[in-house]
């Protein structure tokens, strides 16, 4: 939901409803949680249990209903479809051809944008032609050099996927497919921020670093830990999670290379979002907004949830078989979910000087306890504080450059004169 000029520490549903516009996004799971890989840290594989473990795929009638509802329901002139999983390509090539046809049927003058997140192992020449013809932006999951990537991103035979992903990246380059990289920051990445960044910038010019910080329980007889909502009693940090300190160090190390060598040439989502919050403009990523809830998640059977990190039965909002996306987005439950990002911050966050930069970050990470004993502190808080403290003089200088209508890249000569962190 759009940040509002309300300065109190609590926003009510009525206030939000009066300010809200029906501009929303969707993330759709055409094949649910189905995936050809078995990544250790995947937060979505568990969702198969909600739907009885069946091999799911959204049928064509429901696909048409979804596309029509979304285009007609949002007040936005540009409608962005986010195809996600699991692995969305499991839905099949013909399924996506049909989706493109339906988008054009119902576009009604609106601009249609398609983005798709993939593990990169099922893409072939035919897929590349489809992506290029329909101007897809493809997000490819790649965690870094081979030993880091293959530590957790393996197929169902236990084999690493690095070589297949790199072949896909080369194929998309040849076909002129626009792509970027999503890299998780996990226990194996710790201490290797500069190395990971230098590798990834050789592959792409846009990187999203996603911290892996999960709360899990081990159920009797289960093959893997079960990722649970933040407030679950008895849950513990997952073994693949990165610590707050290690995450902060990782991002500081990435930043120190980037700010000296790559401003304006390579784009790192966290850096862009942080600078945007310094400029008091929308950060472009929900985790760094004051409130959330702008993007509904649509499962393969039409079930709708407020966020793909909160696909649990207790968060189910409705189903497009009998509800409309527009009504679900405007419902009190959805608005309350988005407002809770701000309204449930612990006292430590309310007093924090960095609150305007992170707004408590993603609610899925809020399973720590503050020094004063308040529940709901972000488990990565110390790491974000380290990052914000370290980058503050650089961010303030880039903000000053932007105010003077100069490019942020002009900071690099000054940045190179600043002392480097050890080991870089």
What annotation goes with each model-predicted range?
Residues 67-82, 91-229:
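Radical SAM/AdoMet-radical enzyme domain recognition
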Residues 243-278, 309-353:
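C-terminal accessory region of radical SAM enzymes
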Residues 65-84, 337, 376-423:
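Short Fe-S-cluster ligation motifs
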Residues 21-61:
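Canonical Radical SAM [4Fe-4S] cluster-binding loop centered on the CxxxCxxC motif
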Residues 1-28:
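N-terminal [4Fe-4S]-dependent radical SAM core
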Residues 147-152, 208-244, 266-279, 305, ...:
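Flexible glycine/acidic-rich beta-alpha junction loops that bind and position SAM and/or redox cofactors
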Residues 34-46, 306-309, 346-364, 383:
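Local cysteine-cluster metal-coordination motifs and their immediate loop/turn environment
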Residues 289-292:
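Short, small/polar residue-rich loop motifs at catalytic or cofactor-binding pockets
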């Amino acid at each position: 939901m759009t940040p509002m000029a309300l300065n109190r520490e609590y926003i009510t549903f009525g206030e939000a409803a009066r300010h809200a516009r029906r501009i929303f996004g969707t993330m759709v799971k055409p094949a649910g949680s189905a995936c050809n890989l078995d990544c250790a840290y995947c937060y979505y594989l568990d969702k198969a249990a909600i739907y009885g473990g069946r091999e799911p795929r959204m049928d064509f009638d429901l696909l048409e209903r979804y596309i029509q509802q979304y285009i007609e329901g949002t007040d936005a002139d540009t409608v962005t479809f986010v195809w996600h999983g699991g692995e969305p390509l499991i839905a099949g090539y013909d399924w996506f051809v049909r989706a493109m046809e339906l988008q054009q049927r119902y576009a009604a003058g609106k601009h249609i944008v398609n983005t798709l997140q993939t593990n990169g192992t099922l893409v072939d020449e035919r897929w590349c032609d489809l992506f290029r013809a329909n101007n897809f932006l493809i997000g490819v999951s790649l965690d870094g050099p081979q030993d880091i990537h293959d530590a957790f991103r393996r197929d169902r035979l236990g084999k690493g996927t690095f070589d297949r992903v790199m072949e896909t990246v080369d194929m998309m380059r040849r076909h002129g497919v626009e792509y970027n990289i999503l890299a998780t920051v996990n226990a194996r990445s710790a201490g290797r921020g500069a190395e990971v960044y230098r590798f990834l910038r050789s592959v792409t010019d846009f990187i999203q670093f996603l911290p892996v910080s999960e709360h899990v329980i081990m159920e009797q007889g289960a093959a893997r830990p079960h990722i649970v909502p933040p407030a679950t009693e008895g849950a513990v940090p997952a073994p693949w999670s990165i610590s707050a300190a290690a995450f902060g160090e990782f991002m500081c190390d990435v930043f120190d290379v980037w700010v000296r060598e790559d401003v304006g040439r390579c784009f790192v989502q966290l850096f862009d979002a942080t600078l945007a919050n310094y400029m008091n403009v929308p950060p472009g990523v929900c985790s760094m907004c004051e409130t959330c809830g702008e993007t509904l998640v649509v499962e393969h059977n039409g079930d709708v949830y407020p966020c793909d990190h909160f696909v649990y039965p207790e968060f189910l909002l409705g189903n497009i078989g009998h509800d409309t996306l527009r009504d679900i987005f405007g419902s009190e439950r959805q608005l309350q979910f988005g407002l809770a990002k701000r309204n449930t911050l612990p006292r430590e966050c309310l007093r924090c000087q960095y609150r305007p930069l992170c707004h408590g970050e993603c609610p899925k990470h809020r399973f720590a306890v503050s020094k004063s004993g308040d529940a709901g502190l972000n488990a990565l808080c110390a790491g974000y504080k380290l990052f914000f403290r370290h980058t503050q003089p650089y961010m303030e200088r880039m903000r000053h450059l932007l105010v003077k209508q100069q490019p942020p890249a002009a900071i690099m000569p000054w940045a190179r004169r600043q002392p480097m962190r050890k080991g870089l």
